[in-house]
């Protein structure tokens, strides 16, 4: 696997106890704002001498005399900077670099969690706003979310003052909330990993030098440079600071220029026939020409280190600006690695290739084999999370709700007598009036979330998948996924992007869809046999990774608040009610497969009717998809987060009688519970009870950016929802 083959345990940015290499790969470092990553590198260099210039470049110099050798790698990733703050607390952004790296760069940030790095070194969580798919059939000419003019970042604030109270201000950089995921065959997917593999390789190289007390001939300077995406300014400075006889640049191979007089290429990875794991790429200006003397020296060192190296057509690293191009040393080499899905949230490379760069450099500069590091590990911990956080972070796509059902059962009061029906619904009946004259009341919240399911395994090892639920493909393709296997373990993969995504002028077909176009998942495997060896089978299910992020004040972000908030509200209500409700007939249902046709709730409704116990009233506890967003028209679905629960009077599946809407509103006001009511899109579980005589009165909480990784709630609305369920269970 090479020196870095062990680097495959991958926690998120927030897990500071994670492997050292992972912190190098996931620490935010938007162009011009690389200071945090520089400090992380410095902390990993031990006693090696390191200095930082006023461009932010970090230099480590070892030895003295001639020859003067320079090894360079970039630090920065493309991202955004806060360019404005709206009166209602949203952040406006400017892209860095100002020209988009590819046609889908902005779009792939839509409805995604992000991190804002403040002046005081805080990492503030936020999300990029996205359209809610449930509302779009009733909209006209919605935004495409494909340009900074249509981008807003939501940190949970309601005003400029709250934004600044959170520590966020103009010029603060914004980057994706990164998480690295190991794939098969030593591959890794993570945002910006194509900008960081050089940092990982060179820090490991320097640590190997120090551990081995190795000597290099002459003077060696290793430079970690800033602003590769902003015209190569850090590189330009280094070339004036260090007079080098020879230079090796480790980073993305830039595409060849269209002509000798064309502008320097941006550092987007070159298309290559080589795949991750097949070796190092050596950038050349003419693939057909014999290697020059310096490249031949590196080829010889690669052979001695048993490292594969392939010539690949590429331009020299970019240096922009208005002055003449700074010349590179005559002895110059450009090293990269094959990268899939470059400059997307799911770009993928092989850590074995990264390790090979360390091995090659060590062999070339020291003359011996490098020291292989020890295996890394994930450090996990933390106290038990509250109900909502625990439920939200449990995975359970439609038809695969076992883990969620287990969490619900564990949070129910001791002694709760539940049953699980053939559809997987969890049912709890309370009260002493079953079969009597009391009105039969049902509260139902669904446990499932949207996702995918393995349809078949392709001969090349990729998965062809079916959709479970609906949403915007823009929020999922080009991002990492988790494949949940029958034995309870997971494998990471990447949802592949549409054909042509990396071509100039590509435009994603816009509009709400049920994601039913053919979609593939890349796992890093090379054949169906390799995929089968991972234990993946037809029928295994797939989700986007997720994590609960507190935002400003009482707001929070996570995927699958729809409908884990509803599940939480029912649990909180049961805790408040206790397990005895004299004179009442109340059933609580945590249902399955709502996202694929209300199937679990339909099974419960049918069984109750067949047993002669049909519901009189059903309160479906589910999302009110809200237009409380700068991207949405407020013509309908206008319920503000933080202003209370919502009576979902009208949606696509039900119209609640006004007399009952008004009655719920009055009960809420009588009990001091903040309440709203309105019209939204989507369907609800209660709709399948109406055929058996029930009245459906859906109760909700307002949700921003539904069916995405950017979902945002106000936890005060969850409290209001659980309180109204408690009141209704006692008094309806």
Regions found by a protein language model. Name each.
Residues 5-732:
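N-terminal hydrophobic/helix-forming segments and targeting peptides
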């Amino acid at each position: 696997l090479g020196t870095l083959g062990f680097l495959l345990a991958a926690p998120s940015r927030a897990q500071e106890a994670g492997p050292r290499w992972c912190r190098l790969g996931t620490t935010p470092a938007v162009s011009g704002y690389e200071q945090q990553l520089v400090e992380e590198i410095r902390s990993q260099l031990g006693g090696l001498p390191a200095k930082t210039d006023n461009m932010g470049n970090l230099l480590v110099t070892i030895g003295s005399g001639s020859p003067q050798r320079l090894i360079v790698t970039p630090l920065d990733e493309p991202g955004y900077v806060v360019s404005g703050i709206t009166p209602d607390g949203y952040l406006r952004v400017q892209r860095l670099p100002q020209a988009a790296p590819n046609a889908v760069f902005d779009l792939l940030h839509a409805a995604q969690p992000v991190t804002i790095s403040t002046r005081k070194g805080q990492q503030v969580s936020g999300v990029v706003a996205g359209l809610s798919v449930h509302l779009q059939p009733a909209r006209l000419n919605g935004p495409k979310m494909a340009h900074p003019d249509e981008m807003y970042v939501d940190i949970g604030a309601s005003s400029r003052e709250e934004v600044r109270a959170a520590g966020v201000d103009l010029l603060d950089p914004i980057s994706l909330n990164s998480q690295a995921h190991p794939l098969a065959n030593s591959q890794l997917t993570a945002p910006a990993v194509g900008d960081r593999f050089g940092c990982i390789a060179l820090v490991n190289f320097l640590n190997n030098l120090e551990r081995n007390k190795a000597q290099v001939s002459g003077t060696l300077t290793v430079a970690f440079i800033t602003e590769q995406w902003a015209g190569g300014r850090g590189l330009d400075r280094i070339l004036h600071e260090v007079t080098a006889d020879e230079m090796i640049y480790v980073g993305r191979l830039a595409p060849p220029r269209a002509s000798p007089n064309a502008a320097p290429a941006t550092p987007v990875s070159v298309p290559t026939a080589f795949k991750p794991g097949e070796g190092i790429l050596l950038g050349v200006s003419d693939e057909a020409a014999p290697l020059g003397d310096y490249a031949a020296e590196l080829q010889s060192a690669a052979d001695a280190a048993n490292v594969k190296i392939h010539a690949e057509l590429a331009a020299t690293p970019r240096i922009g600006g208005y002055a003449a191009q700074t010349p590179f040393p005559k002895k110059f080499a450009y090293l990269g690695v094959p990268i899939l899905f470059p400059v997307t949230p799911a770009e993928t490379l092989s850590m074995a290739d990264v390790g090979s760069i360390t091995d090659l450099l060590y062999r070339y500069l020291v003359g011996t084999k490098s020291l292989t590091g020890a295996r890394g590990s994930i450090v996990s911990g933390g106290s038990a999370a509250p109900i909502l956080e625990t439920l939200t972070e449990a995975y359970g796509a439609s038809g695969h709700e076992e883990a969620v059902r287990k969490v619900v059962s564990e949070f129910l009061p001791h002694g709760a007598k539940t049953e699980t029906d053939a559809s997987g619904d969890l049912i709890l009946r309370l009260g002493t009036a079953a079969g009597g004259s009391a009105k039969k009341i049902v509260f139902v919240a669904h446990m499932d979330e949207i996702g995918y399911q393995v349809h078949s395994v392709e001969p090349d090892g990729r998965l062809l998948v079916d959709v479970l639920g609906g949403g915007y493909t823009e929020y999922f393709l080009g991002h990492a996924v988790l494949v949940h296997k029958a034995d309870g373990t997971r494998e990471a993969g990447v949802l592949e992007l549409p054909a042509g995504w990396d071509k100039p002028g590509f435009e994603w077909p816009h509009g709400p869809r049920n994601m039913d176009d053919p979609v593939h998942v890349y796992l890093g495997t090379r054949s169906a046999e390799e995929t089968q060896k991972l234990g993946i089978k037809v029928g295994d299910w797939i989700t986007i990774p997720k994590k609960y992020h507190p935002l400003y004040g009482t707001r929070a972000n996570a995927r699958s608040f729809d409908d884990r908030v509803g599940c939480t509200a029912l649990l909180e209500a049961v805790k408040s009610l206790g397990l005895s409700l004299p004179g009442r007939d109340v059933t609580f249902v945590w249902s399955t497969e709502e996202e694929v046709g209300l199937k679990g709730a339909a099974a419960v409704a049918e069984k109750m009717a067949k047993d002669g116990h049909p519901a009189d009233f059903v309160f479906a506890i589910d999302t009110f998809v809200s237009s409380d967003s700068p991207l949405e028209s407020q013509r309908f679905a206008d319920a503000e987060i933080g202003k209370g629960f919502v009576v979902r009077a009208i949606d696509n599946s039900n119209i609640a009688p006004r007399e009952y809407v008004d009655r719920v509103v009055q009960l809420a006001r009588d009990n001091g519970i903040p309440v709203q009511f309105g019209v939204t899109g989507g369907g609800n579980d209660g709709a399948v009870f109406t055929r058996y005589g029930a009245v459906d009165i859906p109760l909700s909480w307002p949700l921003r950016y539904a069916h995405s990784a950017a979902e945002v709630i106000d936890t005060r609305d969850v409290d209001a929802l659980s309180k109204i369920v408690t009141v209704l269970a006692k008094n309806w």
